[in-house]
């Protein structure tokens, strides 16, 4: 529907040929997604993702909260390097099956996973579709070509694969422990207690099926990720790296049978992206995007530059971050990001604000805003659809009760991170390293406190002194009351 409406609009208003319409599609993004989907599809046949789930249960020692923490961390890490839509496609069936075996409600588990999938995916360029689009649409080459070279002077501020890790990963790390604390509080009843099952039976049923294929495909995936890191040196398009890895993996593992791996590709998702790019270009030709950009730009220009432009930069970052978060929650972060990419360039040039912080504000807002509602991110929709097919529907309200507070919390933390790094620190890498170091020290201290009380690692992450403080306050209040009334403690 997106493809047909977008193409129809372009044809009617601009009378462009089909060849011209295809040039509107960002093939860099399509190629990257296609390559990653093929590789993950091949790896999934090894049984490694099912093995992850069983290992998570073993490490949890029957504790439901420990299982949740392990699953969420695994989901976040996989989402950072495989993209969150693909990760959720792979882990949702495994999680549902594991919940059935342990006699748990799958929906809270699935919601927790997808929330951390969106958080983890925000840390890298390939982790979340909005980041993929930003990395492609706001690369130096893309900026130089945008609107016939209109923004060529901003090309030096374009982003690459490594920039996402350097700029976004520290901010995402700052959200992890608070996110787990909020998750534990929201699901304090569902994620408490233990479930004991026969581990040997689970291992025999959900073990790794093909070690040789896993070794080969894992090595190729490692080379692809290494290629992403080397992109600033090689300048090879990330789409070609991903597609090259996919072709190599198919040749090595499925030389004679290509139908099955290609069936694993989410072709409807790729078609949706293609139509989306055409739609956004048609809006650009009609002047809609410029119209929106002018209003946002006017709101930012209203703020004075201040010393070294800090006041306007801070306002621009926070406005773009929070508008992106709230809008992405209710629109879906993919079309929102596609619309905002050219607007970010327009704001940077028109309001005389550094492009870099605006790019990261858009990326943080779009990715974290996807947690706000069930329709906020494609991964949420995929999870809900698969869960409903398995007989466990996820309602909009149920997701909203957990997702929206998580969005508010993580966006607030990232707001602090962005103000400290870009407004106060001027984007200096030392500020990012300092905040990352403080975060890691805080996590270690938090775990140490919990472990000193005899709690396991997962419980230590969310350990707090509220109950102890409550008991202490009650004890002191009781003594004070007794003293005032003139009665002894025994009486």
Language-model region placement:
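Membrane-embedded alpha-helical segments and adjacent helix-loop junctions characteristic
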Residues: 15-108, 267-269, 273-351, 355-356
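Juxtamembrane and boundary regions of transmembrane helices in multi-pass small-molecule transporters
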Residues: 104-107, 111, 122-126, 146-212, ...
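Re-entrant/interfacial helical elements at transmembrane boundaries that shape
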Residues: 52-53, 86-97, 110-111, 124-144, ...
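Single conserved hydrophobic/aromatic residue that forms the stacking wall/gate
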Residues: 1-7, 11
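Juxtamembrane helix-boundary/capping and inter-helix hinge elements in multi-pass membrane proteins
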Residues: 45-48, 58-63, 96-107, 135-162, ...
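Interfacial loop-to-helix junctions that mark the boundaries of transmembrane helices
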Residues: 18-29, 157-170, 209-212, 231-241, ...
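Transmembrane alpha-helix interface/packing and boundary motifs in multi-pass membrane proteins
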Residues: 74-83, 114-126, 230-232, 321-336, ...
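Hydrophobic alpha-helical transmembrane segments in multi-pass integral membrane proteins
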Residues: 223-228, 276-294, 411-421
């Amino acid at each position: 529907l997106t493809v047909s409406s977008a193409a129809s609009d372009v044809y009617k208003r601009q009378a462009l040929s089909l060849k011209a319409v295809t040039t509107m599609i960002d093939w860099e993004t399509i190629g990257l997604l296609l390559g990653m989907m093929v590789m993950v599809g091949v790896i999934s046949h090894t049984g490694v993702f099912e093995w992850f789930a069983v290992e998570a249960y073993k490490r949890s020692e029957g504790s439901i909260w420990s299982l949740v923490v392990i699953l969420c961390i695994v989901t976040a890490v996989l989402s950072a390097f495989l993209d969150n839509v693909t990760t959720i496609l792979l882990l949702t069936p495994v999680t549902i099956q594991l919940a059935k075996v342990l006699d748990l409600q799958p929906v809270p588990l699935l919601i927790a996973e997808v929330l951390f999938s969106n958080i983890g995916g925000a840390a890298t360029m390939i982790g979340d579709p909005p980041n993929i689009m930003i990395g492609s649409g706001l690369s130096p080459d893309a900026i130089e070509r945008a609107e016939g070279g209109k923004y060529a002077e901003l090309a030096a501020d374009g982003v690459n694969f490594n920039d996402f890790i350097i700029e976004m990963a520290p901010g995402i790390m700052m959200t992890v422990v608070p996110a787990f604390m909020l998750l534990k509080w929201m699901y304090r009843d569902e994620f408490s207690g233990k479930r004991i099952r026969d581990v040997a039976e689970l291992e025999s049923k959900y073990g790794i099926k093909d070690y040789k294929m896993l070794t080969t495909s894992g090595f190729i995936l490692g080379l692809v990720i290494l290629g992403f890191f080397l992109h600033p040196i090689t300048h090879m398009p990330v789409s070609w790296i991903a597609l090259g890895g996919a072709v190599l993996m198919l040749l090595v593992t499925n030389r004679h049978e290509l139908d099955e791996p290609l069936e694993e590709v989410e072709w409807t998702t790729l078609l949706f992206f293609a139509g989306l790019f055409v739609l956004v270009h048609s809006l650009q030709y009609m002047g809609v995007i410029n119209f929106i950009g002018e209003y946002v730009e006017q709101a930012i220009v209203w703020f004075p530059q201040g010393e070294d432009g800090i006041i306007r930069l801070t306002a621009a970052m926070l406005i773009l971050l929070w508008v992106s978060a709230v809008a992405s929650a209710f629109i879906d972060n993919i079309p929102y990001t596609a619309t905002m990419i050219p607007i970010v360039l327009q704001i940077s040039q028109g309001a005389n604000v550094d492009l870099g912080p605006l790019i990261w504000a858009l990326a943080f807002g779009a990715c974290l805003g996807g947690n706000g509602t069930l329709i906020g991110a494609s991964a949420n929709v995929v999870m809900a659809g698969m869960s409903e097919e398995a007989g466990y529907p996820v309602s909009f309200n149920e997701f909203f009760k957990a997702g929206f507070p998580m969005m508010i919390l993580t966006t607030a933390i990232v707001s602090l991170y962005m103000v400290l790094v870009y407004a106060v620190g001027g984007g200096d890498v030392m500020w990012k390293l300092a905040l990352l170091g403080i975060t890691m020290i805080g996590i270690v201290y938090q775990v140490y406190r919990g472990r000193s009380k005899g709690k396991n690692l997962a419980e230590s992450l969310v350990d707090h002194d509220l109950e102890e403080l409550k008991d202490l306050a009650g004890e002191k209040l009781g003594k004070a009351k007794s003293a005032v009334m003139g009665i002894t403690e025994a009486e």
